[in-house]
């Protein structure tokens, strides 16, 4: 299932947040969205996920989600959103219970997604017994349990230390190489964007417009072999971001 964003625009009161956003999210690709603070990245993700409706334009789902998909569009947040009184397995089972799946069928799905996220040994652990990285793995496992057509990821690694963030990026890449999932990934971290994105969408200062779309042609499984190329792409992205930030500062100075 592909996603097509057509002429998305939105205001909150007198503040124009997004303007004229056209974007294709192709099945099997990770599309990263970056931009200055306040440019509308998370707002755009909420429109993709159907949590809000834009004032202008539309988000179209092209094609059908997988036949076994319980929820075509599924969120992963930066704050994990785990219930503290439920174990890792219990937090995953919550989304299955919402769809009436219990018993042996639920246990089979839970065992599968915990294994895929390297959490089999922590099935019965409570969130307070898990590190930040493990908590985010539980959140990823929970999202995978509903077999989504597209993962919507809102700065999922921003609450983690740099070492844990690197390990989680490796895990996400390994998972993608096995499953070829689709993701729309909002981040402020340029290193993340060039490490895991097939393309990077750069939004301008508010109102957020698409300043550039950078295609990263190096296969994900070979990114570590091309560190210098990725650093060059990261510098290019930073130059674009810096120009937008400086322009925003100048606009404030001129007021």
Question: Could you describe each region identified by the protein language model?
Answer:
Residues 104-122, 174:
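Conserved ABC ATPase "signature" region
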Residues 49:
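Helix-to-loop junction immediately C-terminal to a conserved catalytic motif
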Residues 34-36:
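The feature captures the beta-strand-to-loop junction immediately N-terminal to the Walker
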Residues 145-149:
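A short, proline-enriched helix->beta-strand linker immediately N-terminal to the Walker B motif
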Residues 86-93:
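Short coil-to-helix segment of the ABC ATPase nucleotide-binding domain corresponding to the Q-loop/switch region
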Residues 57-68:
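Conserved ABC transporter NBD signature motif
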Residues 126-130, 134:
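Conserved ABC ATPase signature
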